[in-house]
Amino acid sequence: RIDQAGRPHHLLYHLARAGWTDIMLIDRSELTSGSTWHAAGGFHTLNGDPNVAKLQEYTINLYKEIEEVSGQATGIHLPGGVMLVSNGDRLDWLKMAHARNRYLGVATEMISVAEAKKVFPVLDEKQFVGAMWHPLEGHLDPSGTTHAYAKAARMNGAEIVRKNRVTGMRQRPDGTWDVETEQGAVHAEHVVNAGGLWAREVGRIVGLELPILAMAHQYLITEEIPEVVAFNKETGREMVGVLDFKG
C-alpha cells in the first residue's frame, strides 16, 4: 500500500481484521502529514451515490469501535445534522435522497422547517421550504482518527513504514511486484495505490494515467457566536450541523 491521508489506514485496518497480516503501508512522510492535518473533520451521510451514503454511515458507526479497539480517541461528536433546501425543486431532490436512504437502511427523516429550528435556533425559517434530519452527523479529530486506525491495524498484524518514499515499481512475470523505496525493495503480491492527492503521480510510475484531480475546498473559522454558546450551555448538548442546498 502506498499511502496518503486517512482512508488508507481505514482500508489497512479492515484488511488486517479480515486476516491479511502480511501487509505493509508505505508512507513517504509522517502519518497525517498530508491533507489530513488541516481537514475540518466534519462528516455526513448525504451523497448523490446511495452506496457511498451507506458506506459513510457504516464508517461513522465504526469510529466508536476503533476507539475501543485501539484506545486512541477519535474526538467524535454526534450532535446530528439538518439538510435544508430553499425551493421546491431542491425539496423534491431531498425527498428522493431520503427515500433512497431509507431503502438502504440509512435512518434519515424528513422534518419541517419549524422542527429544524428547534435543533438549530439561529435558523431564519423564511429562507427555507423543507429539511431532512439525520442523527449520525457531526465532526471528529482527523489526526486522532487516523492514528486510531493505524494502531488498530498494527494490533491486528499490519506494518506501517514511515518516511519512505516509493521511487519505482516493476511487475514480475508471475504478476507480483517489486516496489522500490528509499529504504530498499519490497516484494508484494498486490499493490494498492492509496496516494490520495498524489495517486495520479503514483499511477504514472507504472504507466497508468488516472483521472484524478485535486479539488480546492474551504471552511470558515469564526469567533464564538453568543447564540450558539448559550444554546450549548442551556441544553447541555452541541448545536447540530446544517447544510444549505440552494441548487
Regions found by a protein language model. Name each.
Residues H9-H10, R200:
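Residues forming the Rossmann-fold NAD(P)(H) cofactor-binding site
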Residues G41-V119, M239, F245-G247:
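Dinucleotide-binding Rossmann-like beta1-alpha1 core, especially the glycine-rich loop
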Residues E65, S86-R162, T167-G175, E180:
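Flavin (FAD/FMN) cofactor-binding and adjacent substrate-gating region
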Residues M169-G247:
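Flavin-dependent oxidoreductases
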Residues A16-W37:
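Glycine-rich FAD pyrophosphate-binding loop
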Residues L12, A16-R17, A152:
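Gly/Ala-rich phosphate-binding loop of Rossmann-like dinucleotide-binding domains
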Residues A5-R7, E30, L197:
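Residue-level detector of alpha-helix initiation sites
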Residues R1-P8, M24:
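Beta1/beta-strand and adjacent pyrophosphate-binding region of the FAD-binding site
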